[in-house]
């Protein structure tokens, strides 16, 4: 069975965030927090989460999203949701 690595998920998440923020310079690490990324405000957060759900073919629960502290938490949530 083929598994997606954390780095592959991070790369896809980065692509989604770049697209949603219309900023090809965005660079994410597992430790990145939303407030450290220009333009990643509450409205952008909703758009990013919806785009990630569509990109990965998954659906998040609100309680899952509200518990995210950084991009690494998001990557692990995506991995667990697949």
Give the residues covered by each predicted segment.
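Two-component histidine kinase catalytic core, primarily the HATPase_c
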Residues: 44
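Thiotemplate assembly-line natural product biosynthesis machinery
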Residues: 2-26, 80-81
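Generic recognition of well-ordered alpha-helical segments
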Residues: 15, 73-76
């Amino acid at each position: 069975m083929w598994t997606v690595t954390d780095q592959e998920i991070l790369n896809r998440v980065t692509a989604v965030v770049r697209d949603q923020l219309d900023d090809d310079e965005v660079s994410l690490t597992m430790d990145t927090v939303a407030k450290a990324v220009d333009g990643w405000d509450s409205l952008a957060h909703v758009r990013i989460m919806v785009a990630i759900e569509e990109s990965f073919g998954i659906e998040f629960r609100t309680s899952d999203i509200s518990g995210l502290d950084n991009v690494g938490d998001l990557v692990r949530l995506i991995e667990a949701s697949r």
